[in-house]
Amino acid sequence: EEERRSYIQVLDQKSMRLKVLIEDLFEVSKASSGTVTLHPEHVDIISLLKQVRFELSDKMSASGIEFRFNLPEGRVILYLDSQKTYRIFENLLVNIAKYGMPGTRAYIQVVREPEGYVNISMRNVSAQELNVSPEELTERFVRGDSSRNTEGSGLGLAIARSFVEVQGGSMKIEVEDDLFRVVIRWKENAQEGKEAREGQNQERQNQERQNQEGSLGAEEKPGMEVYRGPE
């Protein structure tokens, strides 16, 4: 009876992995052929990245890797499909958690370039020396390690690249021995980016003005309540 339950459990696990494989293969095939349906909207990728980080916090902690995020203050608005972009970030962070070396650090950074592009980079140390080229890593079913002893379809990077490119961006992978780095580059919507930066500057100026007024008010009339206007 115990042996039978064990066999059933193994079959359930294999069935689930096959289901994931089929779904992932279907997704990457649609994206590669250009038949994927997009629902673009103005997305704050900083908030989205923080959401992915929160929802993967247990998996990231269990990996033994220290994830360091260097994110700009305020919003970075891009015109993207939020669900597809979430999947991109999720796949890349899960890839680090699965294949990164425990006890090392992973660095995630978002940088606005002067010429109107936004770069999202993730770099980490692989648990094993990467024995394939960057091009091969984004091919279907390639994982970059010879043991292939971890769960997954091997499609994570391929899906991420396809979803980046179908949304007008580029995804570059750099490999040197056991060092792994991926850089996503998207063009920022000029008007939205300008409005977001102006909004951030205005918020910063308002905060500085309020701090100065509060300081002056406190010096002139201690204990006086300073009216800030409607919330």
Residue ranges and their predicted role:
Residues 13-18:
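Short alpha-helical segment of the dimerization/phosphotransfer core of two-component systems
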Residues 33-38, 77-80:
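Conserved micro-motifs of the catalytic ATP-binding
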Residues 39-42, 61, 66-76:
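Conserved catalytic submotifs in the C-terminal HATPase_c
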Residues 103-116:
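Short beta-strand/loop element within the Bergerat-fold HATPase_c
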